[in-house]
Swiss-Prot record:
Residue runs in coiled coils: none
Pfam short name (any one): TRAM_2
Note on cofactor: Binds 2 [4Fe-4S] clusters. One cluster is coordinated with 3 cysteines and an exchangeable S-adenosyl-L-methionine.
Protein name listed in UniProt: Ribosomal protein uS12 methylthiotransferase RimO
NCBIfam families for the chain: 30S ribosomal protein S12 methylthiotransferase RimO (TIGR01125), MiaB/RimO family radical SAM methylthiotransferase (TIGR00089)
Physiological role: Catalyzes the methylthiolation of an aspartic acid residue of ribosomal protein uS12.
Cofactor(s) for this UniProt protein: [4Fe-4S] cluster
Keywords noted in UniProt: 4Fe-4S, Cytoplasm, Iron, Iron-sulfur, Metal-binding, S-adenosyl-L-methionine, Transferase
Amino acid sequence: MAEPTSTLSTATPAAPRISFVSLGCPKALVDSERIVTRLRAEGYELTRNHDGADLVIVNTCGFLDSAKAESLSAIGEALAENGKVVVTGCMGAEPEQIRAVHPSVLAITGPQQYESVLDAVHQAVPPKHDPFLDLVPEQGVKLTPRHYAYLKISEGCNNRCTFCIIPKLRGDLVSRPLNEVMREAEKLVAAGVKELLVISQDTSAYGVDLKYAESRWKDRDWATRFFDLADALGDLGAWVRLHYVYPYPHVDRVMELMASGKVLPYLDIPFQHASPTVLRRMKRPAAQEKTLARVLAWRDAVPDITLRSTFIVGFPGETEEEFQELLDFLDEAQLDRVGCFKFEPVAGAPANALENPVPDEVKAERYDRFMLKQQAISARRLKRKVGTRQQVIIDSVTPGGAIGRTKGDAPEIDGSVKIASRRPLRVGEIATVKIEAADAYDLIGSAVGF
């Protein structure tokens, strides 16, 4: 877990100390930030050491068996080092699985149950709060570095993909009103955040549940809609990066915001597959047969757009012909950044009941072929950047330079730029870098313009 960015530790020496472990996706990280912010507001101090804490909170992931194993391991480690552990998050929706392995945990709550987490903490370690001494930053306590932040715009999902249990864990789509999201975003930017990463389970469905109701922001009524939110965020002066976007037709409108520079020319779109028959078995939303045409149209509208996606190979019933359709799609779409997963059954997912499961050795072979093809595509696309000048946000400083990311790279999941510089660069600074070399995933360059 990253060090919380609140450096104001003015609580009394006797303030209870909480150690926090956050596992899983960025949506879970935002949940962790909300809990941590409430704890700091109540006078609790945060520590990274379990053995020096009065209590440990573990925010779990329960999407895949491997994630559950990691969560159970983290709980066991916390129990061994501390003994007082509160468990929350997606795996908390199945408390019997946790109790079977770790019966001594103090409490288990499901995802988004912030009040239940706080109640459990209060019972185990009552707060010692002095509102005149304790101070929490207005933007809340963040678990990311200071210069970027995840902005969660909704909870839950209305889709019913057969490989996924997110609706079971987190419920149907619940969008936050646009003015509420904008107030949070404005506070983050005022606190020094240079990059806002917009996240949800289905970002392009934002506002559907509210029937796109209008809300007041900056003397104007804005619809609670994907395009309107992106447009409003683009006025804040920070990089705006859009994640978990489904290829619905209305996403086309966002191209004008990218072309004008209001939001980054970047889309994270979880295609998952390209074969129409596999997609039907997956029950994926959107008109997938038009996806390739849409990708090509986006590239025409915004030539420098970066498209990232994730795919699943070895889905039940996947034939060699269907897998070849996926490889052909990679050739035609020429995506910039791609992740791939071998299908893994998730307890409670309808896909588990589908016929003709793919043998593990076939999954592994297809995964290797997929990654080899995409690696070559990514390398060719990055090579095009050699000789160009790119705006790069600095993530860390190194002797004689820094490590950063272009507008086409999200933190943690995409590539980076290794930068040589004659002057010191600062974390969070946006520098102009001349790209001098590239490999399959990363760039090398020199800072210019000084």
